[in-house]
Amino acid sequence: MNKTIVLAGDRNYTRQLETTIKSILYHNRDVKIYILNQDIMPDWFRKPRKIARMLGSEIIDVKLPEQTVFQDWEKQDHISSITYARYFIADYIQEDKVLYLDSDLIVNTSLEKLFSICLEEKSLAAVKDTDGITFNAGVLLINNKKWRQEKLKERLIEQSIVTMKEVEEGRFEHFNGDQTIFNQVLQDDWLELGRAYNLQVGHDIVALYNNWQEHLAFNDKPVVIHFTTYRKPWTTLTANRYRDLWWEFHDLEWSQILQHHMGEFELISPLDKEFSCLTLTNSQDLEGIEELVTALPEVVFHIAAWTDMGDKLKKLAVYNNVRLHPQIVPPVLDKLKKSTNLYLDINHGSADENFLKSLQEQEKTLLAFQSTQHGELGQIVFENGKVSFMIDTIKDFKKNGHLTCFRQLPSLTCLTFTASQYIEQLDYLAGQLPNVVFQIAAWTAMGPKLYDLSNRYPNIQLYPAISRDKLDELKEKMDAYLDINLLTSTSDIVAEMAHLSKPILAFYKSQNGNNGQRLYSSEHPERMLADLQKLITKDMLEKPLDIIQVKGIDETLDYIIEHNSSLVRFGDGEINMLAGHSIPYQDYDEELVSIMRDIIGQESREDLVVCLPDAFTDRFRFTSWAIPFWKDHMDHYMDFYRELCSDSWYGSTFVSRPYIDFEDKSQAKAQFEKLKSIWENRDLLIVEGATSRSGVGNDLFDEANSIKRIICPSHSAFSRVHELEQEIEKYAGGRLILCMLGPTAKVLSYNLCQMGYQVLDVGHIDSEYEWMKMGAKTKVKFSHKHTAEHNFDQDIEFIDDETYNSQIVARILN
């Protein structure tokens, strides 16, 4: 499609004409550009005309008579009288459809869609002016055939004569030159275009001050960008939208337009190419700015302000690497915020706190001096006068893409003593808190993992092979202790820290000893981060949530004995299943999980005690292999426990497991005696898996009066739960029921308790009793029956036992 475009200008406006033409030709081929003028030298046309021809386009010099009717007509100060030349378009341009463009605009994309718009017998199509009523005459898609037929030139001149007289006599307010005349003559004869075809940015600052939200809310790509009003990119620094783009087209070489159409060149914003820093200021005083600017010539410094700027700031424009943005508007500031690499919080006086918070949310690196820091927003803070330190930091960031050296004044110092190179979430914390120093100390040399972290994060400081004196010095100077080292315990050092009355923060999985630590899940390190930020701002830390209360083994047994209670035990396996997982002896089952969720939510009472693992308050009375298990378990599931469990107390799940996982095993014998006293001289009904054979080969149930057994599937017994309940009811009369059947035991115990039976869920009791009797220090596999959590019942050689066989009253097997 051949596209006919008309521009108008004079010899004082050739720079602007040239910029507009460059933008047209950059985005379009096959255009015919008429330039209405009276005094532009023919020499000026040669270069753009040559380039246009290579793109299948033309540039035509249209000279208007020197003495023209509009020479002395009224106009606004920033507008040339040549603007009235568009009255004469129909006289000089023969094409039927013409696009008129002012020369204070740039084209931002192809004009194909604009030229394809049907004018529907209207004289022109245009975009509304900022008043929302009239049209702006800077972009006019003209029905030139109709202009000729209806002698529009004559009508415009006649109306101009009448209106000019009213203006001269002071009877016409808000006169806007030929735009006013066009609207008077064509007030009902124009088609409205979308804003994209004439995005008027000259009123941006006015829109901001007057809260014209819609004016600044345009987010689509504009086709034409119009620099209306006197706030032009070449006359003012006012930071309206797309000001920088006008200068990019202004500086564009004609040859680069050809290269663009050959696929060899793209106009890329300097913001996307240069390394830059941003400062938004409310004052003229920027700490160390000239030293920064002169020392870092390859770094661009963007200085923005909501208001106009004073001479002190404007003088900085003499530096090639300074960009001033006075009277900036939010869209321009947002663009700078996204594009710049660093923010320099170096302005004295007040600051836009919401803007600074938005930078923090975007994880932008902020640098500040002590005297200019605004709030506690994770700034890297340098001592006053240490501009050279900030210079080195900017160089470091520019070279590496992140900070590798640490010259700032720390806002908080945290110490960790370690006996391994594994420090939980250290990289996350160091990255999120660049102004916090993380000191890592050890008695020995350190591994490569820690050195790698210290190279990546300049705020990690390593102290390998530390002396006692140096460690004591670090202890005294630290603000908080982070008990976050893994593997080898450092509980003795943490105990020392507890005497200093300084905060000790730990993850459940990294906790070393019970030393008053504030505990967090390592799966939510942002919670520890939030508390460290409170320590930076010296805010009070919130009181930790109350610990879930679980009675000890003896206290639980005493309660059961006193009240003849039933017992439902939830261990780690049941919690895994409640969280949506299958476990070795029970496939995941929605119905089972729903029932267990209801049971664990019950309040313990005299007839039913709900039990949880007694590992909420002390995970360090277990063996060396059990401690990390329970630390990891609580790290992963503590939130889940709090969601499920709201009762004021629970019994201990360990009532049937009082031996193998405890470091101190001396109490287990007495606890088993308490257990055995419950069924002494009582008739028992044991409900167990086919491989359990509880009491076979030991005296666990010797004091019972009699025993009956119901044998069930060892795996996924819940699939037969209704049959099991029916069989149990047949034989349960007058008997104490012992259930050893994994998650299914929870359902049976609860349901049978509701029917009035006393039921004890005592899974794993037989293995624990065997281990206690043999004095085992670790789990020993039994060859003739099930071993708790060992080998999943493989390689068992069952021994025929007449007593055991005689006790079986029912078998319900898969």
UniProtKB/Swiss-Prot annotation:
The keyword Isomerase does not apply. UDP binds at residues 8-13, 102-103, 226-232. Pathway: Protein modification; protein glycosylation. One of its GO terms (molecular function) is nucleotide binding. Residues 1-264 are annotated as: GT8 domain. Keywords: Glycosyltransferase, Manganese, Metal-binding, Nucleotide-binding, Transferase. CDD domains: GT8_A4GalT_like (cd04194). Residues 542-814 are annotated as: GT-D domain. Transmembrane segments: none annotated. Changing E789A: Isolated GT-D domain no longer transfers glucose to an acceptor protein. SUPFAM superfamilies: Nucleotide-diphospho-sugar transferases (SSF53448). One of its GO terms (biological process) is protein glycosylation. InterPro entries: Glyco_trans_8, Glycosyltrans_8_dom-fam, GT-D, Nucleotide-diphossugar_trans. Mn(2+) binds at D102, D104, H226. The keyword Cytoplasm does not apply. NCBIfam families: glyco_access_1 (TIGR03728). In the N-terminal section; belongs to the glycosyltransferase 8 family. Encoded in RD10, a pathogenicity island with an atypical GC content that is associated with invasive pneumococcal disease. Pathogenicity islands account for greater than half the genomic diversity observed between isolates. The main function of this island seems to be correct synthesis and export of pneumococcal serine-rich repeat protein PsrP. Has an N-terminal GT8 domain and a C-terminal GT-D domain. The GT8 has very little glucose transferase activity in the third glycosylation step, but is able to transfer galactose from UDP-galactose to PsrP-GlcNAc-Glc-Gal or PsrP-GlcNAc-Glc-Glc in the fourth step. The C-terminal GT-D domain catalyzes transfer of galactose and glucose to the acceptor protein (PsrP-GlcNAc-Glc) in both the third and fourth glycosylation steps. Involved in the polymorphic O-glycosylation of the serine-rich repeat protein PsrP. Catalyzes the third step in glycosylation PsrP in this bacteria. Transfers glucose from UDP-glucose to the terminal glucose moiety of already-glycosylated PsrP (using truncated substrates with PsrP SSR1-GlcNAc-Glc); the C-terminal GT-D domain is sufficient for this reaction in vitro. Also transfers galactose from UDP-galactose to the terminal glucose moiety of already-glycosylated PsrP; the C-terminal GT-D domain is also sufficient for this reaction in vitro. This is Glycosyltransferase GlyD.
